[in-house]
Amino acid sequence: MTAQKWPALRVESGQATAVKDNVVVEEAIKLYLNDELVTELVATPTNLEELGVGFVVDEALAKDIQSVRSSSGVVAVYARSARKRPWKLQSSGGMGTLSDLPKVSSNITLTPDNVLSVIRETTSELWTRTGAVHCSVLFLEDELLVKRDDIGRHNTIDKVVGFAILNEIDLSRCIIGCTGRQPAGMVYKVANAGVPVIVSKAAPTYNGILTATDTGITLICFARGDRFTVYANPQRIRNLSGEAAIGPLTCASP
């Protein structure tokens, strides 16, 4: 169950009306890797096996996933080899440090129309009902593969990556579209998955931009209507016009 009806009092211009509102449901999820507790997450209780697999890969805990199962608020992931590192919860919802950034290599390119097509898919039915969830989508080049929503923006990334891994999809040919802001921890997740492009409706942070630049990810934010802003690695965007479309990103001195 992702939402429940709840009695509430809606007030407009001082006039009160009794309503039954759709309210999103969340649950505490315990995630185990090779029978060892890794973390506890608060998540929308759907697609939990994808969430577990995606989290393990996106946090660089393991890549060679053997199996996954979920039951009663517990997700158990099994991998042939798992890294053991001192983990620290990040404010972005990620874990670990950003000291060993991966490099993302891909020949994928996209047009402005591709970018806007991606972001148009990030409105979900659950968000329309509750207004309380984030959404991420996964495109294989220009084909929409999957859409996942969750109360946590980081969980939506883990879910679409988990879907790709469980379905043996080449993530180096993929684009992730999402609704959440992009701090370093979010970009780090996508880099560990090997996805070369992030398209977001929301803002980046300074460290998010630095992380995208260093990992080789094309970071596109404020994608709304017919516009967007490219903050890192714009070489993957083709069919651009204007003088600024030529050459690397530069910034005038303040």
Feature map (PLM): residue ranges:
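A charged, well-structured terminal subsegment
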Residues: P234-L249
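Active-site/ligand-binding-proximal alpha/beta "capping" segment
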Residues: T250-P254
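Histidine/lysine/aspartate-rich catalytic loop segments that bind and position anionic ligands
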Residues: S124-I169, I175-I176
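Feature captures the catalytic cores and cofactor-binding loops of soluble hydro-lyases/lyases
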Residues: H154-V230, R236-N239
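Intrinsically disordered, low-complexity regions enriched in acidic/Ser/Thr/Pro/Gln residues
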Residues: M1-L140, V146-K147
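Short alpha-helix boundary/capping segments
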Residues: A43, R148-G152, P204
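Short, intrinsically disordered/low-complexity patches at protein termini
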Residues: A62-D64, I169-L171, E243-A244
